[in-house]
């Protein structure tokens, strides 16, 4: 049976199979079909998490590749190996083309289907955060006007998500915390604003700490995990100089979190 003929439930099941097989490109295809079938109704929590996980894995592999290649490129430039640098730049360009295609794919889906169909505050924040995330991934490697546009679009999406999150979601809500985590990473990495990054992360952490006793048992694990990541970043950012080049800035976990999971 061709995947185009599958029902919504069957596409969801096939996406789960693809996830188990670690075939994330196909997982994306199955979940895109699901997303495009729901013009007026929202995806379920399970469906939106499957879509997010699929794209996070597909983009994550390329982001990791890009970072490795960029690091090698810097080393070869430092050694004056111009012939190798030319080869590396071409190869990096190939990865950047893939990154752009992936980001464009999910951003188009968010614009055309997911954001317009969302009504619950939780799902609105989830999708606007996702929109900000993928514009941020573009800003990581784009240059000039393209980088500026990507950064501006990231800010608009995160700010819209933040406005709803602060008004509608509890400080301990995993999606609100995940937004604060990624928004602060954007300030630190893309806008080079460590003070603003620390301020945002600290405020989110402190507000969640003050309401920790109100956390439901289902959300406790998810929320405290993201709080730990916020704390890790604050520790990293507030230290004068990080001696360890292997230290990584933490983002919201690959498996996007929601209540009850």
From Swiss-Prot:
One of its GO terms (cellular component) is nucleus. It comes from the Eukaryota. GO terms for biological process: protein localization; regulation of gene expression; signal transduction. InterPro entries: 14-3-3, 14-3-3_CS, 14-3-3_dom_sf, 14-3-3_domain. GO terms for molecular function: DNA binding; protein-containing complex binding. It holds the Pfam family 14-3-3. Is associated with a DNA binding complex to bind to the G box, a well-characterized cis-acting DNA regulatory element found in plant genes. Belongs to the 14-3-3 family. This is 14-3-3-like protein GF14-12.
